[in-house]
Amino acid sequence: MKLRVGAALFGLGVLLLVFAAGLPFYVAPSVTKLPYDLEPTTSVAEAKNAKFLKITRVGESVSIEVLQGDLVSSVEVIPQPDDTRDRLPEELKGDAVIWDVYQTVRRSDTSDVVSQYSTELALDRISGAAAPWKEQWLNESGAEQTPVGNVSYSGQIYKFPFGTDKRAYQVFDRDLKRAVPAKFVGTEKIKGIEAYRFEQRIENEVLNTPEASLKPLLGRFAPGATSGQIVYSNTRTLWIDPVTGSYVNVREQQNKELRPDTGTATVLLDADFNYNDDTVTRSVDTVKDNRFKIGLISFWGPIAAGVLGLIALVVGVWLVTRTNDGAARHRADPAVAPGTDPTRTRVDQEPVRDAETAEQPRTEPAGGPLTDEIPPASTNWKSEDPTVPTQRAAHGEVEQR
């Protein structure tokens, strides 16, 4: 029985050691990739006392004005597992996922829509950067039809790589339609999570504004101007979880100015957007959960399996060798003859007697020791011992002393 148990434990130990070695190399990489069935997420940022451009169209009339108030921006990310399976080209299958993203900026007091956009893009499952997919698109005007391939995404957009490094990354800016470096500036604790802080500075960049969009603005704010441009600045601060590459917190200090060729500039946007507390809390909770899964499979799982495997291996070997030693000793013992006492003692040792069964010393009679042996019959022996009676003389003989 011990031999079987030992062999089973030995085999279990080997399996656990193989499992421990395979976890970080074969299983862990699967959890450090964007999943196909990722749940939709929504992040909310708020800007207090912001200045913003509001264009209202009622029939053929258009109202253009700069207002001031609180703004709320919500970004919803919806993964598309079916499109990922069916629409990606062969060179991207297995390595990228398709996401649909929608952003809406509203006034806090009236819920009126200030701006909105929608987009569809492909992201690399490991790096989180935009994948070179020809069918990506971006709709900023709210048009019903959007030309496919009207935007070329590059760099990080909604996620950083798994295992983010302390270095600069290219981060895509939707207003510029290109990626700009975001520099690593340090680490910070956010609700118990150590996050990497990156800053991207965009200063006085001239936006590519269609003439049809620029003319109404010049007519409203600079009637005497014949041309102008919109100048854009943004300081974007990103707090990234280095393990998963997820956004923990985001801040964007945006500014847009209309600068006509004559007249004064007009501020079209001056807003400081920050993730609200609920979004930060949910981001931290998600990061903690994903960190636990990654750590369990890539670190703690292999350690636990390795330790248990070694224990099972050692115990199994010990049981097998102990059983073999016992069998060897059993074979070395001399056989006991049938009918003999296996517990007999050596002749040079005192026998061990039980107190109750030990033989008691005999009391010899006064006449001498008794014996069961009968002396041989003789008529010519006599003893010098006076206590032994002499043999009576035969008839006609003289008794001799």
Regions found by a protein language model. Give the residues of each.
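Membrane-proximal low-complexity regions enriched in glycine and acidic/polar residues
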Residues: 155-249
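Primarily hydrophobic membrane-targeting regions of prokaryotic envelope proteins
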Residues: 245, 316-320, 401
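Short, cysteine-centered beta-strand-loop-beta hairpins and adjacent loop/turn segments enriched
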Residues: 106-112, 204-215, 257-264
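Solvent-exposed coil/turn segments that connect beta secondary-structure elements
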Residues: 49, 201-205, 255
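Membrane-proximal extracellular "stem/stalk" segments
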Residues: 218-305, 312
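Acidic/Ser-Thr/Pro-Gly-rich, low-complexity N-terminal segments
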Residues: 330-401
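Juxtamembrane interface at the cytosolic side of transmembrane helices
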Residues: 2-8, 292-347
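Extracellular or lumenal secretory-pathway regions
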Residues: 2-163, 277-298, 319-326
